[in-house]
């Protein structure tokens, strides 16, 4: 006797994008194509998995089941055999996975080492650049110091020149110069007077060496001294 | 009134369907509600039934997981479950069936011995889960677990299939089961 079985169905709509939460507001419009992408990728993975399951069922159904009616114990023995085979296949798979993982590990370790080397070299480069910068700074400082010194020398020179010029323009010098000029004029006049005296006296001054010397001396132009 | 077959229909896109079979309507409804509240990226469909076979008139999607709920307090539930199991296609027992025993917390009310359900699960080579569906927190945790199980059975998790999961779960079972 079969009882009338009741059936009720309850459903729940999916959260697109996979995050359980309130529905997205208008501000998240930019995120929707990405959600669609993730949804599509998820559907693709699901369909792949389901296809795999169907394929394996088809393959399993192609196997021939034994026609004879075997005893229960034999059936159980066969079941155990098959289970053992499955276990062996699984362990072989696990070993392969471990081997691959170890290779992967090696690669990762190498990558890590290389990264460390890169970081060290970068650090060294940084230090050298800093040193270069220091040397350049020092050179700049030295240049500036030498510039200052030269400037000082120039100002000193200029000052000296100015002093000299100012000195020349001072009144004392002028007075002395005036005096000198008057003296020179007086002496020149005296020279001319003596010259004319000696020449006027009509003496032969070439014969007497002392007289000759005096006359020649009188010829000296005092302004040239 | 034909037997349920696991792969006779094409799966719905992003949909996973679970069938809860048991005599305790209130418990099933509560469990269904907890499952629908759980976090899941796929669409969930929960069908409830008192016993198999299901009426053919209803157009239902492909069922990915069947959970038989046995209440340890009542012998009727165990009987009904055992009767329903005959109407199931053998292909279902490759990972798409699970047994859920409830009511083990209150030992004084238990009329079915724990070992009975254990033997039942062992005979059908299916996983057995224990949960007190009356307690809110346990129910929520079990609902989460069932949702994950359902996702794998529906093929939504790449790399793990129902059969794979079955052998994985069996590996962690108590080895003393073999003595039964």
Swiss-Prot record, chain B:
Annotated keywords: Centromere, Chromosome, Cytoplasm, Kinetochore, Nucleus
Q: What is its main location?
A: nucleus
Check the record and name the Gene3D superfamilies matching this protein.
P-loop containing nucleotide triphosphate hydrolases (3.40.50.300)
Sorted alphabetically, which InterPro entries does this protein's record hold?
Centromere_Cenp-M, P-loop_NTPase
Assembly with partners or alone: Component of the CENPA-NAC complex, at least composed of CENPA, CENPC, CENPH, CENPM, CENPN, CENPT and CENPU. The CENPA-NAC complex interacts with the CENPA-CAD complex, composed of CENPI, CENPK, CENPL, CENPO, CENPP, CENPQ, CENPR and CENPS.
Xref: PANTHER family: CENTROMERE PROTEIN M
Protein function: Component of the CENPA-NAC (nucleosome-associated) complex, a complex that plays a central role in assembly of kinetochore proteins, mitotic progression and chromosome segregation. The CENPA-NAC complex recruits the CENPA-CAD (nucleosome distal) complex and may be involved in incorporation of newly synthesized CENPA into centromeres.
Protein name, please?
Centromere protein M
């Amino acid at each position: 006797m079969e009882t009338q079985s009741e059936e009720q169905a309850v459903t729940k709509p999916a959260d697109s994008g996979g995050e359980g939460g309130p529905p997205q507001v208008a501000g998240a419009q930019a995120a929707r194509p990405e959600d669609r992408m993730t949804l599509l990728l998820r559907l693709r993975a699901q369909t792949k998995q389901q296809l795999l399951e169907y394929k394996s069922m088809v393959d399993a159904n192609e196997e021939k089941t034994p026609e004879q009616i075997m005893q229960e114990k034999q059936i159980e023995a066969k079941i155990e055999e098959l289970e053992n085979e499955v276990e062996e296949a699984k362990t072989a798979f696990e070993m392969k996975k471990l081997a691959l993982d170890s290779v992967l590990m090696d690669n990762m370790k190498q990558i890590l080492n290389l990264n460390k080397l890169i970081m060290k070299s970068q650090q060294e480069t940084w230090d050298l650049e800093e040193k270069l910068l220091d040397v350049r700074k020092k050179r700049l400082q030295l240049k500036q110091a030498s510039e200052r010194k030269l400037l000082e020398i120039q100002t000193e020179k200029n000052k000296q020149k100015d002093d000299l010029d100012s000195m020349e323009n001072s009144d004392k010098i002028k007075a002395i110069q005036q005096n000198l000029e008057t003296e020179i004029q007086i002496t020149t006049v005296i020279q001319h007077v003596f010259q004319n005296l000696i020449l006027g006296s009509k003496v032969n001054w070439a014969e007497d060496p002392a007289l000759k010397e005096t006359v020649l001396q009188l010829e000296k132009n005092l302004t040239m001294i | 009134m034909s037997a349920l077959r696991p792969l006779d229909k094409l799966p719905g896109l992003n949909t996973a369907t679970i069938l809860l079979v048991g005599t305790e309507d209130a418990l099933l409804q509560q469990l269904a509600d907890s499952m629908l509240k759980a976090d899941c990226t796929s669409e969930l469909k929960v069908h409830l039934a008192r016993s198999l076979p299901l009426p053919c008139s209803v157009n239902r999607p492909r069922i990915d997981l069947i959970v038989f709920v046995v209440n340890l307090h009542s012998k009727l539930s165990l009987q009904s479950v055992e009767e329903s199991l005959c109407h199931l296609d053998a292909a279902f027992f490759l990972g798409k069936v699970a047994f859920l025993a409830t009511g083990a917390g209150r030992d004084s009310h238990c009329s079915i011995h724990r070992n009975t359900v254990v033997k039942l699960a062992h005979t059908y080579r299916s996983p057995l889960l224990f949960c007190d569906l009356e307690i809110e927190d346990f129910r929520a945790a079990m609902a989460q677990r069932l949702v994950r199980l359902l996702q794998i059975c529906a093929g939504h998790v790449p790399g793990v299939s129902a059969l794979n999961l079955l052998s994985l779960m069996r590996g962690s079972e108590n080895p003393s089961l073999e003595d039964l």
